Amino acid sequence: MIVADSECRAELKDYLRFAPGGVGDSGPGEEQRESRARRGPRGPSAFIPVEEVLREGAESLEQHLGLEALMSSGRVDNLAVVMGLHPDYFTSFWRLHYLLLHTDGPLASSWRHYIAIMAAARHQCSYLVGSHMAEFLQTGGDPEWLLGLHRAPEKLRKLSEINKLLAHRPWLITKEHIQALLKTGEHTWSLAELIQALVLLTHCHSLSSFVFGCGILPEGDADGSPAPQAPTPPSEQSSPPSRDPLNNSGGFESARDVEALMERMQQLQESLLRDEGTSQEEMESRFELEKSESLLVTPSADILEPSPHPDMLCFVEDPTFGYEDFTRRGAQAPPTFRAQDYTWEDHGYSLIQRLYPEGGQLLDEKFQAAYSLTYNTIAMHSGVDTSVLRRAIWNYIHCVFGIRYDDYDYGEVNQLLERNLKVYIKTVACYPEKTTRRMYNLFWRHFRHSEKVHVNLLLLEARMQAALLYALRAITRYMT
């Protein structure tokens, strides 16, 4: 994914020279610049102006190559450059990513990449599927397996059911699913193998959310020629290219929205300091209201379902199975997952530490890196305490997956998260393949792109933690 030798440094400079004031050679000539302009922006993201993401992201990566030099022999990819807008988080992310896919472990390297293919294919994430297909072959994988699941070993095919549930409805996972994989037989999984596989599946599901949420594009050829662009939904084909939100035409209204958001944040922080308590019954009622209202938070009806690509369908069983709202009208909903009954800190982390000790600490660090990441800024304002906003985003993501915190007032979610942001969050977390540039542009119109990437880091980690909590709870019940 990223390399720290001279080849990598040259590649980073290739990225940087296309940003204003870039390093390296004097940059592309006038003819080359005009050619690039005719082709349109050709950066790592379809949503973020090339100058911003390449300048900040690539420079951040270059400054952090000392750590990566010890661990990798890949290439700098577009995902890494965009995530590099937040280098402190990227360090934690990369440590776990490298552990899961490149160090010794219960599963063979080629198997891990095949599991990653299975996970990414559930969301039709061609970016990750293609990347892991290449690495699968590089690590000695059998090319026959790439013809589809039917060519893979039975042991891998047995992961399909839990892969499907983790990707779309993790609350349906039970101890019986765990038992079916661990029961004695010819194609049985060991507990150590299964834990690594489950962490890898949730890692790649949530990484698919990040890829779609940030509009990550395939890498271009080495000579700088453009790679195929991400498909654009028909409803957006006439949309103009993404603009810097700090200069958008609705600047006055957007600036007023920022001021109003900051006022609400300040009021909430003051009420917390005054300890204006809310009864437990009222807290529960507000959660149920938020969960019910999330039914109405859906993408626009004119957004067409993306057509599954045959190259990915071959890795997917039951392709029509997808996310369904945790609480559906007229349906018997599963019981709410009370976070206090099975927390990451007290239950999930300790189980992972026992069964996959090298991964538990890195997982915890990655969750904390995303949750606590702050620059104390909002749009054009600095010195801002953003903790209540970050908590509202994290808890709303868990809410759409049916997880409730008894000590959290879900009234804060409605006060802090505008509808466009809710639509974006739910789409990226639950059915990321439906994410569009228009959704990205509509929320937080006066915020920096790096702040929108920050939202995607919260999405990635909150989604992964939610799915892991359901899976680890099922394992705990199986073991007791």
Swiss-Prot record:
- Region described as C-terminal domain: 308-480
The EC number(s) this enzyme carries: 1.11.1.-
- Region: N-terminal domain, residue numbers: 66-239
Region (Disordered), start-end ranges: 20-45, 222-252, 272-291
Major location category of this protein = cytoplasm
Q: Which signals induce this protein?
A: Up-regulated by hypoxia and DNA damage. Up-regulated by treatments inducing endoplasmic reticulum stress.
Quote the annotated effect of C314S: No effect on ability to decrease intracellular reactive oxygen species
Query: What family classification does the UniProt entry report for this protein?
Result: Belongs to the sestrin family.
What is the protein's given name?
Sestrin-2
Q: Which organism is it from?
A: Homo sapiens
Where is the organism placed in the taxonomic lineage, from the top? Eukaryota, Metazoa, Chordata, Craniata, Vertebrata
Encoded by which gene?
SESN2
